Amino acid sequence: RKLKENPTIEEIICAPGNGGIAADAKCINVSAIDLANMVEFAKNEKVDFCVVTPDDPLAMGMVDILEMEGIPCFGPNANAAIIESSKVFAKNLMKKYQIPTAGYAVFSDAQEAINYIRTQNRYPTVLKADGLALGKGVLIAQTEEEAVQAVNELMVDQAFGQAGKQIVIEEFMTGPEVSVLAFTDGHVVVPMVSSMDHKRALDNDEGLNTGGM
């Protein structure tokens, strides 16, 4: 909506869009992960600037491809987006640069993960699929049985496909979860107002995680 208020912008096109956005932008029926058709559409429409926000196309390198075609973008390239698309990478990055984070261990073998759970015997414990899972790849186990079930769901049953090829088993931390975002051009950082993502499906912060609201 803020883009629409800018007098220098002639038209806003959103793909794939939805009923709410349709009031402010022209919506086209192209999947966000259909990079080839998305880039082709942007070229044909002579798009001057592209804002790429969903996790999947960022991880797949949409910004890289568009910029190679001469279309400037707002959004990280694939090398930067891996901070969001791989929890293992993000945790190891924080460890490398001594950024405070919950204690964790990484596993690519289900039985090794189960052995670790039984050795630690600490609950609640948090299990996370390494890759993108629409905000649903984080499971909080209250018991050993739930933790083992979560490992099998993520790694054996592959509930989230390749996203669960590796998992992170993480220390459970209590307290309000806050999202702090910022804009940067690589030199200057401008923070936005902090917010809270209400991820649980039920009231009183109960139920499974969702994509968030």
Please give the residue ranges for each predicted region.
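Phosphate-binding core of ATP-grasp and ATP-grasp-like enzymes
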Residues: 154-155, 173-213
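ATP-binding N-terminal substructure of ATP-dependent carboxylate-amine bond-forming enzymes
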Residues: 1-78
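A conserved helix-loop-beta module that forms one wall/lid of the active-site cleft
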Residues: 75-137
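Short beta-strand-to-turn element immediately C-terminal to the catalytic PLP-Schiff-base lysine
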Residues: 107, 138-143, 182-185, 192-193
